[in-house]
Amino acid sequence: CHSFFGTENDHDLVAKTGRARSINRHSWNDNDLKDLILNDKNPENYLFNELRRRIRIRRKQEAFHPNATQLTLHFGSSIFAFWRESINRKQCIFAINNISDKSQKISLLELNLIGTESWTDLLTDKKFTANDNSITLEPYQSLWISNESRSS
């Protein structure tokens, strides 16, 4: 539950049980949880809706099919990245995630984007070309750069 909503750690439960694992074992009352995610002033509301948006986008991408080809890309310890190709080989997605609390610059040349295709970040609709040299990812930012966009 905590991962879906970004809820706060339950330090009181840790103190009560004496177990560190209790930090994310809070039992939620349905109404309290609904109040958190339905109030657009709460960060839990934003996180829940953003997760839902990303799931909707992801479900429409052939390259995210469970049987699609996947390769891990190496951009250092602050970047978690992988490349996926749809079964029919029409769609490629470069999923690039900054897993650090600092901005990270990566070379788009290392992705080897095919110059004859248009490339779009599925999360922001930002366009990329094979001529773009690099991109800076903000802390914890993710990009899903695809050559074939399925509408969100």
What is each stretch, according to the model?
Residues C1-Q104, L109-E110:
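Loop/helix patches that line or flank the sugar-binding groove of alpha-linked glycan CAZymes
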Residues W28, N97, T120, N131-D132, ...:
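Intrinsic-disorder/low-complexity regions
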Residues R54, W119, Y140:
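A residue-level signal for conserved active-site and pocket-lining positions in enzyme catalytic cores
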